[in-house]
Structure formats: structure tokens, C-alpha cells
């Protein structure tokens, strides 16, 4: 599959880097939609309650002035449907419009990584029990 790679080491793009998940860019230094796998040992080292591989996806924050915050559900921008241009989820959406969950802050009009698959915290407006179905909603 094109535009996908595993971090697998502390060297990213020829430079020492452990902070790539939180990096914010002014330009598309990777093609939007690029996927990156963070190995299970790196995921667990960053948060001991997390396990398994985590897949990140490179996106553009298409919000006019609102930054993504850790745990925000990010959906495809439905005003122009530009591939991998994200907005904060403000309604119940079809799963194919959901891009992922913000793993950290990503300023409006900037590029960065969000979590597409794997264990992470998700902002919600109520309790969640094991086996509960999680959906995006207008509040939360």
C-alpha cells in the first residue's frame, strides 16, 4: 500500500525523532493520507496503559480557528470533501466520514498526525463500558 510506513526506530526522515506524533507543520511535508504505524513497544512506552500497534494518518486541520485537542473525534470536512481535510465532529456521522482521533493538539490551518487505529483516549460526554458502541454525536 502506498504512503504507508512503520516508524520502527528513533530515526524519522534521517533525523532523531521521538516526537513525530505531536509535530505540527505549516505545509504538507507528507502527502495527506499518509499512514504511519507506531509499533506496540513505542505505544506502551508513551503510555503504559496502552497496548498494540497504533496507526496514524497525516491530515490537514480545516477548521477556521479551532485547534484539535487530544481525544477529539475528527471527521472529513463535508463542505468541500477534500481528502484528509479534517474538522471536529459535531454530529452523528457515518463511519466512512470519520478520519480518526486527535492524539494531541493540532492548530487550525496546520498539518499533523491523528490516530486512525489503535488504543487511545476519546473525549465523550458520558460513561463508556466494555463492549459499548462508540459513535460521534453533536455534543461531547
PLM ranges: what are they?
Residues 2-140:
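Extracellular receptor-binding modules and their adjoining Ser/Thr/Gly/Asp/Asn-rich linkers
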Amino acid at each position: 500500500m502506498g504512503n504507508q510506513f512503520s516508524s520502527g526506530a528513533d530515526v524519522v526522515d534521517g533525523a532523531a525523532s521521538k516526537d513525530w506524533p505531536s509535530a505540527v507543520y505549516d505545509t504538507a511535508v507528507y502527502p495527506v493520507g499518509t499512514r504511519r504505524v507506531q509499533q506496540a513497544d513505542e505505544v506502551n512506552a508513551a503510555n503504559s496503559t496502552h497496548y498494540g500497534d497504533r496507526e496514524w494518518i497525516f491530515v490537514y486541520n480545516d477548521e477556521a480557528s479551532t485547534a484539535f485537542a487530544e481525544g477529539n473525534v475528527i471527521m472529513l470536512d463535508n463542505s468541500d470533501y477534500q481528502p484528509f481535510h479534517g474538522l471536529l465532529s459535531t454530529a452523528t456521522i457515518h463511519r466512512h466520514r470519520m478520519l480518526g482521533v486527535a492524539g494531541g493538539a493540532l492548530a487550525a490551518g496546520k498539518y499533523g498526525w491523528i490516530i486512525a487505529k489503535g488504543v487511545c483516549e476519546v473525549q465523550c460526554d458520558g460513561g463508556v463500558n466494555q463492549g459499548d458502541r462508540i459513535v460521534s454525536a453533536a455534543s461531547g
